[in-house]
Each structure stands twice: as structure tokens, then as C-alpha cells.
């Protein structure tokens, strides 16, 4: 089941890039990011209430709060950079560079989360990096 959600994420992320590139014409990148973020906030809280998870907010530990806030700050910084890059460059070049986050995530997961980094992972990272270079050059 996780695979279907991951595939859905990839499909929606692809749609996001195209819709954002079209929608950002004539709009400041920071304003566009703020509008997008408002929609995401409304949608996310809607899902919390639809699934009756709002009561769980009181059970979130201080550590979880800190890391969720840090994650939110990183997401915001990522979106601000992404929208500015998308406004200035071609989606066909911006998106592959943005997807280098896969390689960076694998490395960070190995360093900080002590997740396994196999030979297959190394080859995959090299191929993603090479593919990104091929697409943007």
C-alpha cells in the first residue's frame, strides 16, 4: 500500500510543477508560495478533522513538536527556493535539480538516521546524479 501512496506523491508532485509554472506567471514567487501554502494548510487540517485525529495534538511530545517545526521551516525554505527557481528557469531544468533531494535524503538518512546505504543505493545515487546532469546540461 505504501507504494501506491508513494506513486501518488510522485504524480501529484509532477502536476504541482506544471501547474505552478503556469500559475506563477506575473505573480511574485513569495506570494505564489504563500497562496500555495494556504491551500495546503486548509487541505491538511481538513484531513485531520475528516479522520478525527485532532484530539491527538495533545499527545505530541516536545521532541516531535521541535522536529515537526524544523521540518516545516525546511519545507517553507524549499518551497520558496523552488518557486523562485521555477519562476526564473524552465521547469524541465528546475525539476530534475529539485529531485536531487532524493540523493541528499539518502545520504542524510545514512548519516543521521543510521539507515543502510547499500551498493545498490550508491549506484542509484550516481545514476540519479548523472541523469540530472544529463537533463540540465
What do these predicted regions represent?
Residues 23, 32, 85, 111-113:
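Hydrophobic/aromatic residues within transmembrane alpha-helices
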Residues 44, 120-136:
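Hydrophobic transmembrane alpha-helices of multi-pass small-molecule transport proteins
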Residues 1-11, 27, 40-67, 79-88, ...:
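Membrane-interface interhelical linkers
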Residues 15-40:
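Juxtamembrane helix-loop-helix junctions in multi-pass membrane proteins
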Residues 102-122:
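C-terminal transmembrane-helix exit sites in multi-pass transporters
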Residues 10, 14, 18, 45, ...:
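Hydrophobic/small/kink-forming positions within alpha-helical transmembrane segments
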Residues 31-38, 80, 86-106:
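Helix-helix packing/entry segments at the starts of transmembrane helices
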Residues 29-37, 62-68, 95-96, 121-126:
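Cytoplasmic-side transmembrane-helix entry/capping segments in multi-pass membrane proteins
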Amino acid at each position: 500500500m505504501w507504494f501506491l501512496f508513494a506513486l501518488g506523491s510522485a504524480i501529484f508532485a509532477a502536476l504541482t510543477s506544471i501547474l505552478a509554472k503556469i500559475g506563477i506567471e506575473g505573480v511574485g514567487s513569495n506570494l505564489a508560495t504563500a497562496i500555495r501554502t494556504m491551500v495546503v494548510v486548509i487541505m491538511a487540517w481538513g484531513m485531520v478533522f475528516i479522520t478525527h485525529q485532532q484530539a491527538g495534538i495533545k499527545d505530541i511530545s516536545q521532541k516531535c513538536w521541535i522536529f515537526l517545526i524544523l521540518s516545516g521551516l525546511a519545507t517553507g525554505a524549499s518551497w520558496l527556493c523552488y518557486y523562485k527557481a521555477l519562476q526564473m528557469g524552465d521547469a524541465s531544468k528546475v525539476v530534475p535539480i529539485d529531485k536531487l533531494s532524493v540523493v541528499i535524503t539518502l545520504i542524510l538518512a545514512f548519516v543521521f538516521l543510521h539507515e543502510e546505504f547499500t551498493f545498490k543505493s550508491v549506484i542509484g545515487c550516481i545514476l540519479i546524479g548523472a541523469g540530472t546532469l544529463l537533463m540540465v546540461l
